[in-house]
Amino acid sequence: MPNTKSAARALRRSERRRLRNRMWRSMARTFIKKARKLMEAGDLEAAARVIGDAISTLDRAAAKGAIHKNNAARRKSRLMKRFNALVKARLQQGQEQST
């Protein structure tokens, strides 16, 4: 319970920011989960589109201060590393089948 008017205002402001930050973090997590699920299913074209959305959301969340910029960079890196490994494996399978 705030003791002063300014503390009450700060509490309201803090709650608004907490909810806004939670929205950005949730959106980022949702896109990452969707991308992982599509990659596991083998749908790389759809995964590429969702990864673009995930990266955009992570960048915006970092810009708005919902997550730290290094956290966003790490998540993007891990997502792309997994995606690129799948693409590389798919290309190698295609080359082996054609020879």
From Swiss-Prot:
Which InterPro entries does the entry mention? Answer: Ribosomal_bS20, Ribosomal_bS20_sf
Does the record carry Signal as a key word?
A: no
Which one Pfam family would you cite for this protein?
Ribosomal_S20p
Task: Supply one GO molecular-function term.
Answer: structural constituent of ribosome
UniProt-listed GO biological process terms: translation
Coiled coil located at which positions? none
**A single Gene Ontology CC term:** small ribosomal subunit
The alphabetized UniProt keywords are:
Ribonucleoprotein, Ribosomal protein, RNA-binding, rRNA-binding
UniProt family annotation: Belongs to the bacterial ribosomal protein bS20 family.
Check the record and name the HAMAP family matching this protein. Ribosomal_bS20
Outline what the protein does: Binds directly to 16S ribosomal RNA.
The protein's name is: Small ribosomal subunit protein bS20
Organism, scientific name? Thermomicrobium roseum (strain ATCC 27502 / DSM 5159 / P-2)
What's the encoding gene here?
rpsT
